[in-house]
Amino acid sequence: MFASTEIRLTFCQDRPEPREDDSYGVVVQESKPALKVPPMYKVVMFNDDYTPMDFVVEVLEKFFNLNRELATKVMLTVHTEGRAVCGMFTRDVAETKAMQVNQYARECQHPLLCEIEKDG
């Protein structure tokens, strides 16, 4: 009915001679995985002849968290140079932001376009 359990604690310095039931192993230290910095992607906004400048500023404020002044500067770069970088993100975040901007622009009936490009 009753099981008996024997617990034996031994320490290497206390034991003068090895016993036949002892087992010796290798001490393994876990190494931390080497993490690489993920590649970054630019979200690029392209100019068109139909989207109002105020809408572009609104999009930059809403989806890229830019303040009014910086959003206006990016909008003017898009307007004068034909394109501008709205931000740098990891691939998943960049794809999501570009998709959100494109979807929001379509819902508001504007042809505004964002795409992603690998940095470097």
From Swiss-Prot:
The gene is clpS. It comes from the Bacteria. InterPro entries: ClpS, ClpS_core, Ribosomal_bL12_C/ClpS-like. Involved in the modulation of the specificity of the ClpAP-mediated ATP-dependent protein degradation. One of its GO terms (biological process) is protein catabolic process. Binds to the N-terminal domain of the chaperone ClpA. This is ATP-dependent Clp protease adapter protein ClpS. NCBIfam families: PRK00033.1-2 (NF000669), PRK00033.1-5 (NF000672). PANTHER family: ATP-DEPENDENT CLP PROTEASE ADAPTER PROTEIN CLPS, ATP-DEPENDENT CLP PROTEASE ADAPTER PROTEIN CLPS1, CHLOROPLASTIC. Belongs to the ClpS family.
